[in-house]
Amino acid sequence: MTALANIRNFSIIAHIDHGKSTLADRFIQMCGALQDREMQAQVLDSMDIERERGITIKAQSVTLYYDHPNGERYQLNFIDTPGHVDFSYEVSRSLAACEGALLVVDAAQGVEAQSVANCYTAVDQGLEVMAVLNKIDLPQVEPERVIQEIEDIIGIDAVDAPRVSAKSGLGVDKLLEALVEFIPAPTGDRDAPLQALIIDSWFDNYLGVVSLVRVRQGTIKKGDKLYIKSTKDAHLVGSIGVFTPKPLDTGILEAGEVGFIIAGIKDIAGAPVGDTITHASTPDVDCIPGFKQITPQVYAGMFPVESTDFEKFREALQKLQINDASLFFEPDTSDALGFGFRCGFLGMLHMEIIQERLEREYDLDLITTAPSVIYEIVKKDGSIIYVDNPSRLPEPNNIEEFREPIARCQILVPQDYLGNVMTLCIERRGVQVDMRFMGRQVQLIFDIPMGEVVMDFFDRLKSVSRGFASLDYNFERYQVDKLVKVDVLINGDKVDALAMIVHETQSRYRGNALVSKMKELIPRQMFDVAIQAAIGSQIIGRSTVKAMRKDVLAKCYGGDVSRKKKLLSKQKAGKKRMKQVGNVEIPQEAFLAVLQVD
């Protein structure tokens, strides 16, 4: 049992690639939690995809015992947070479990928007934030400039910020000493009624749901009966302990500590992230504030290439959902693609990761339609509906108002690229809200339609700023605008999976661009394939994939012209008959062409 005064709960806030997971590895090594032969890069990133992409998706925790030079032994509970904009709710839950945070900044690159957003979240939640300069052994570091940036942009004192190299371990021992001095000890009465926060939950095939919790007050012991506030269910604690990073069964968790609970919960919905746990004997304990149900921001249709894989696909999604409460799916049918699922995601990265995991871990071949956001539609009779699939829109003459979601985007960009970034935001129908100059960086705040942000805004932002701009966004409001649905017809048949919702002013351009892109992607058939873009019954763009044809006149050397005409008309009649019964094969790239229309 560790006294409250000797516990430190902290998190690391960092932008992608600023060295958060590497610094965690050094902490684990220095506190002797793993032997050298067990060490591997990114110890806490347990998924293969996390290691390959170098990103952290799920929150992880590790309890380390640190012997301070003053002779005291401290329990350090480090809670790892995701760094990507799609996973910001998981970050806020991880931070709610801490008293302090280390803001790790790359001493060469400087401050990025994602760190700023997460840092503001930490400050709002009352955490002490300590700046740390990482990668100090690189030749191109500019520590003085970066310290100035941290003070200008985030507003925390960084003059005495420890300078470390997580890769080589330089300065990490001094950082651990500073951390113990700087971050406050947790408070909480160990004899009060139990109140604990669920930081993260995941599913284990043998144990059921494993929940990572932070005990605010009270004590949890093995065999206790727990009560989960939002689901109102009671469960018996089967196993309880801490990660060192390997699970270590301690049989008890007390106020101020972070650890895991296994209580035989069969479904991840039974232990939602951010919820409050108490004892079944004291169900009236107050909830820890900040809990919210996660709502998907981006929707896309996913269909198995082989229709026989449908059940396998359903099982795969159910298994993924067990571990990822933010993934939403419902059955969907498409005239062009058959049976599949409409899936909801937190953002484009989340969607890519889910698709990659389905293909890699479950060996599925999938066709994914272009993603869309949720639109609010006011119908003529005054009723309001929410539509996430363009093919489910009501008829245009039945729509009174079309409202689209607007995202508040915070962009940090060096002054040299300010013009390019502002042009991009305005092209994407953005409205400037604020602009602040902070040292060599500029903070731009724009309101941009969510549909424009989720498409390829992030990639375009990186390319116009040579990778220096960074973005953080969140949903702001719904706003009325003139939007239309553009349908794609192939040989006169609507392909529901290719429909898109665009602004009226861009509809002709986007329709024509999509049609010409499709022409490149659909392979030539034995008959002409007409590709058309239409708004309602009005055709706004067309192109034709020309038929492959055999030279039927090859063996006519001279001779009567009527003989040639007869052969040509016979071929023409055959092609016409083919067109009536022929199916056009549409490759996966064509469905994603909607994304690439600039």
Curated annotation (Swiss-Prot):
UniProt record, GO biological process: positive regulation of translation
Subcellular localization(s) per the UniProt record: Cell inner membrane
One MF annotation (Gene Ontology) recorded for this entry: translation elongation factor activity
Domain named tr-type G: residues: 5-187
Gene3D superfamilies: 3.30.70.240, Elongation factor 4, C-terminal domain, Elongation Factor G (Translational Gtpase), domain 3, P-loop containing nucleotide triphosphate hydrolases, Translation factors
Residues the entry annotates as binding GTP: 17-22, 134-137
Residues in coiled coil: none
Entry's EC annotation: 3.6.5.n1
Keyword annotations: Cell inner membrane, Cell membrane, GTP-binding, Hydrolase, Membrane, Nucleotide-binding, Protein biosynthesis
GO cellular component: plasma membrane
SUPFAM superfamilies in alphabetical order: EF-G C-terminal domain-like, P-loop containing nucleoside triphosphate hydrolases
UniProt topology in membrane: Peripheral membrane protein
InterPro entries: EF-4, EFG_III/V, EFG_V-like, EFTu-like_2, G_TR_CS, LepA_C_sf, LepA_CTD, LepA_IV
Described purpose of this protein according to its UniProt entry: Required for accurate and efficient protein synthesis under certain stress conditions. May act as a fidelity factor of the translation reaction, by catalyzing a one-codon backward translocation of tRNAs on improperly translocated ribosomes. Back-translocation proceeds from a post-translocation (POST) complex to a pre-translocation (PRE) complex, thus giving elongation factor G a second chance to translocate the tRNAs correctly. Binds to ribosomes in a GTP-dependent manner.
NCBIfam families xrefs: lepA, small_GTP
Name of the protein in its database record: Elongation factor 4
Species this protein is from: Psychrobacter arcticus (strain DSM 17307 / VKM B-2377 / 273-4)
The encoding gene: lepA
